[in-house]
Amino acid sequence: MALAGGPDSFLHHPYYQDQVEQTSPHHPRDLAGPGFPAQPDRLAPHQEDDVDLEALVNDMDASLESLCSASETAPLLHNGQHARGPPPPGARPLRPQASPRHRVPRSQPLHILAARRLQEEDQQFRTSSLPAIPNPFPELCGPGSPPVLSPGSLPPGQAAAKQDVKVFSEDGTCKVVEILADMTARDLCQLLVYRSHCVDDNSWTLVEHHPHLGLERGLEDHERVTQVQHTLASESKFLFRKNYAKYEFFKNPTNFFPEQMVTWCQQSNGSQTQLLQNFLNSSSCPEIQGFLHVKELGRKSWKKLYVCLRRSGLYCSTKGASKEPRHLQLLADLEDSSIFSLIAGRKQYGAPTDYGFCIKPNRVRTEAKELRLLCAEDEQSRTCWMTAFRLLKYGMLLYQNYRVPQQRKAVLSPFSAPVRSVSENSLVAMDFSGQTGRVIENPAEAQSAALEEGHAWRKRSTRMNILGSQSPLHPSTLSTVIHRTQHWFHGRISREESHRIIKQQGLVDGLFLLRDSQSNPKAFVLTLCHHQKIKNFQILPCEDDGQTFFSLDDGNTKFSDLIQLVDFYQLNKGVLPCKLKHHCIRVAL
């Protein structure tokens, strides 16, 4: 900040006045000179002594030059503190003018070039009795900087860069979102959840979709969206969908790593928990091994080879199942590649099975000849290979991504209302027929209690229908259409489409959806995932006392509508292999 005016402009500053009174060796009378008439000292006694006029003028000139030299070294420059000490050797005094009246004109700005050279020297002369005041305008102290702020004087990276990202939903709708350049996939998902008024259960994911290559993968929560977007082709796009299996291997690793596929390099055996720790520990070296169908680069043929996955890459054996270094050939590197699942491997690449996946180098955009295509024998094997690839590549980053939502929930829990968490371990069958309740431990008795609960739900629904309904529709008509308002009902979709949706949103136990039956127009189908397998259960209508009910078990447990049926099987397993936990959902952006 340039300071205008002559040296006397400092004298009007109160802080400078205190410094002058404390440190200036000159008497106020000595500060007067040509152009600065001295004020008469009213307190001093009038002296009648003769004064040497020539000596007085010389003293006044010397005092004025000393003051100008001190002004050039800017005693107020650093944090408003007066620098005590001699000026640096590099500081040049002002040139003497021909006339003393033009030596310090009032309109001349303060010369601060010499003062800038004092920035480092002044640090050691700064007084310790006064607090350090930070410079509010550091960009003005650089050499060649203008005295006023301008957009060009700001650092080039200070302004946050923004970029537009187009995100598609499952129903084909899209939304253009303006995001920051450093926004991660998790942050963008939370933004879309907020704007779409969805429930944030930390299972949303951003999917990188390549329709021309038949590939897709879920972005990791820590990945920057703009960096991934720069590698996409014009046909590629981002999808916003659920993925309940994103971190399921941390909760139940036994379903993801079969014992016959996992080998140990440092120890011969270990538990599943130790296996995860070895995957997360960069110093250990667990391996995944097994036979895979491998497509040759540039050809349409597939070969079944013995493959092993390590931290250094994916290798195949050129001699049976031998893992000797001279028999191993590198197929793909983990660092500069990403793993994708094949959407239609049989149709597009002639894959021998439906459980294909691909390791795609990050530099590849449109060419399929550089893709490393592989196929497993079943879904569990494919999930094991893909999960191990993610763990070996990202390590602790995945565990940190998994822990972040839980840590946020723990921080916010004291500020939120307590919500009861319903889980399998906290639910037991109870008998309240007597004066006190008791836990039913006999499985057969618990099954009969579940059937009685179903009859109780049916009676309560019938009683409500008899009392009347506020809906203009007839109660029986309302019970047959009210399920269409639920997210878990997907209408008239085929069996293949329902299986595809469940696979996309994660093969976890309890993932389900309801749809119209294609074989029976009056029936419905419950599609449920259990142990990474998809099963279908038909829901048939039945009549009792003129009322229409729905049942999964041939009329043993009846419900007046599908909402009651879903609510019941979320709490009771009944005839199903597991309880209903997660429902497939499609959100329109």
Swiss-Prot record:
GO terms for biological process: ERK1 and ERK2 cascade; gene expression; insulin receptor signaling pathway; insulin-like growth factor receptor signaling pathway; negative regulation of D-glucose import; negative regulation of insulin receptor signaling pathway; negative regulation of Wnt signaling pathway; positive regulation of cold-induced thermogenesis. Belongs to the GRB7/10/14 family. Adapter protein which modulates coupling of a number of cell surface receptor kinases with specific signaling pathways. Binds to, and suppress signals from, activated receptors tyrosine kinases, including the insulin (INSR) and insulin-like growth factor (IGF1R) receptors. The inhibitory effect can be achieved by 2 mechanisms: interference with the signaling pathway and increased receptor degradation. Delays and reduces AKT1 phosphorylation in response to insulin stimulation. This is Growth factor receptor-bound protein 10. It is found in: Cytoplasm. The modification Phosphoserine is found at S99, S145, S413, S423, S426, S471. Residues 161-245 form the Ras-associating domain. Interacts with ligand-activated tyrosine kinase receptors, including FGFR1, INSR, IGF1R, MET and PDGFRB in a phosphotyrosine-dependent manner through the SH2 domain. Poorly binds to the EGFR. Directly interacts with MAP3K14/NIK and is recruited to the EGFR-ERBB2 complex. Interacts with GIGYF1/PERQ1 and GIGYF2/TNRC15. When unphosphorylated, interacts with AKT1 and when phosphorylated with YWHAE/14-3-3 epsilon. Interacts with NEDD4. Interacts with LRP6, thus interfering with the binding of AXIN1 to LRP6. The lineage of its organism: Eukaryota, Metazoa, Chordata, Craniata, Vertebrata. It comes from Sus scrofa.
